[in-house]
Amino acid sequence: MQILPQSLSKLTRYTALCALFIAGTGDLKAQNIIQKLSKKFLSAEKDSTRSGSFMVLPAVGYAQETGVEYGLASSYNFYLDRSDPYIRTSTMTLMGTFTSKHQSNFKFQTDLWTKNNDYHFVSEIRYRNWPFNYYGIGMDTWKADEERVDQKLFRVKLEAEKKIGHNLYSGINIQYDNFSIRSDSSDHIFNQSNLIGKEGGQQLLLGVSQLFDNRDNVSYSTRGYYAKLRLAYAPKLWTREDFNGTNLDLDFRGFIPLHQKVTLALQGIFRSTFGKTIPFYNYRELGGDMMMRGYYLGRYRDKNYLASQAELRYRFHPRFGIVGFSGIGSTFSKENSSRYVPSYGGGLRYFFSLEHNSSIRFDYSYGEQRAGEKRQSGFYLSLSEAF
């Protein structure tokens, strides 16, 4: 028995065939998209076009002093001259986050290498309306002394280096900072201390630098050495509490290939601030996501900071790697003696660009455990290597 008229039956069959064709086409498109994404993000083949790479990550977190944090972090890696086979990777990074307590943090950075690596330009523009935890000065501070301090920072930093010899660069730099600081707790150690700069201030730093760099790759180094000296002076331009002195920064790195896929990476730093007037916000801070991972940045702070770290890197696949690291460091001054504390942990690496060796870094690190306190630790997600 024919339930549908013949014309309607033909129309139904035609519609069904069209639906099957569209569904099949949709499946093919979906498969093509999956294949393209798989090739782009998982393939072990390097892009022969030497094109740039772009990555965006969500920035989500929670802390008692900020509430819920949300935003984006992005990185663009490229060559300023793709025709130069020896040119180094240039990078532009942009990050912006907000919080449920109306705080904000914006940072734009560039690291540019020109043709033949003749010139190297670094810049940073930052606005930060963000609280930080203050524990005191020196290495003998305690979690119980933690105090929230509100801070607004505006920063502009420019640096230019010129090649003067084989792997050797000389440079000049300028940096302007404007700090606005406030603490509502009059009975806490921050307001009761004799610190300089408790309400903020501004500073202009003029400096010179010397760099030796023969690393094989600036994004993920597997062999070579890096040594940089930076000296910057802040003249007395504004109020009597603004910084008037000198910043000295030394950074040494070595990368030793132990195997085709295994690298031992080493780093040592020394940072010092000295002069007639040194505001507390210019003191050197231990911790963060680059050196002495596992410690809150500023958990220990003083006029001098000395630290070193070693990282064993195993890149078992062109797209993936694992690392283990350890470090030791301390702040110190004439008033406060040094007390070296450990840092150790491990992490995963995903390389989103094989051409530029650009990576996403997942690290978890531990620090010391002071008497009566929990062991200090931290998780880090970043769009670059620690060093």
Tell what function each PLM region has.
Residues 26-49:
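Sec-dependent signal peptide cleavage junction
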Residues 46-56, 61-202, 286, 357-361, ...:
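Gram-negative/organellar outer-membrane beta-barrel architecture
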Residues 53-55, 69, 105, 151-155, ...:
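Transmembrane beta-barrel architecture of outer-membrane proteins
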Residues 69, 83, 130-136, 179-185, ...:
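Outer-membrane beta-barrel proteins
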Residues 56, 72-74, 108, 156-158, ...:
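Membrane-embedded beta-strands of outer-membrane beta-barrel proteins
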Residues 211, 217-316, 322, 328, ...:
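C-terminal outer-membrane beta-barrel translocator/porin domains of Gram-negative envelope proteins
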Residues 1-34:
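Bacterial Sec-dependent N-terminal signal peptides
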Residues 207-208, 289, 345-353, 375-387:
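Outer-membrane beta-barrel "beta-signal"
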